[in-house]
């Protein structure tokens, strides 16, 4: 989760490129050498029949339908380099992402939840739950071109994506701890006590919330670093009342981690505690059976994949599968770090194998950015995306084998160039065994 860092600045089937031997699949199942990418629908800025290109969205499956919810779209403007369109819409697809129907145009205008991005959506017991997130709001005395974020502490649920019920407007996990590091000038009180970049999952009949952040980072705040990250764990039966499992998990406080369930364990993978240094990103993997007692399954060097936020992981064919993410620690020329172009798998979260260097059929040799002349022309590069969403889906037409679907995402870079706002997606891809 990128926490609104400053923005300075069909169907095609092709086999995924493999840079390492892709481990054998489960007994009787495919190996990842046999997986390929299918573009279900391509990015289209002109369409009105699908959700707009966006990042920080959420996608879930409920009753054999796919739902896409909210998120942010960068908006070109000369006055406000941070301007974004914040969505509160809900879309549904009954044909595995090929066509979409809008169920809700704008939740906030309808008197429901405020439009948001970098929140969590989880399904449990026939409901879609949305939890936390953030928005941009005008806030004085901030400069007129900076709009600090509002962080949300509410929980809503719906059976159909149309009618929503508020479970709480002040979740217990929103109790903000005091900041212990002094700043100059000092940090003022937060606009709200909610959090974004939190991780949520349904596990053992409960909703779980892990970590997250509150407050904008320096690139937005332009003042003291008032952003706080958390390492607490909470659970709830229905999102209305939350109970503390631990206020100090052994993993370092962070936002943008991935929470997954596999083999009776809740796993937590990667994330970030900031965007200014190499040590701000994580590639560790932890697991728990009760939310209180945790064990680290990776060694001192972490997982095989590089530390990153903005990534996504899912479970398919009895493996964790992780891809994407944000890795640009030095986003300016001549160094210009690029995002990781790789796919990694693991059965146990401890031992990882790289099975591809071309997620979404990306050409890894085309990842370095070339600056055009004159400088007002767009740059040429093919950054791998971050802040997309991903889930495992099975069934549908023809009894599809369990497959990974991805939705949208961000490829913006932190250089003031024309067209940067168009480096964002509303495509849908499937990563599945070759038929």
Question: Where does each model-flagged region fall?
Answer:
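Kelch-like beta-propeller repeat domains
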Residues: 23-435
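Sec/Tat signal peptide C-region and signal peptidase I cleavage site
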Residues: 18-21
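Bacterial N-terminal signal peptides
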Residues: 7-16
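Bacterial N-terminal signal peptides that target proteins for export
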Residues: 1-7
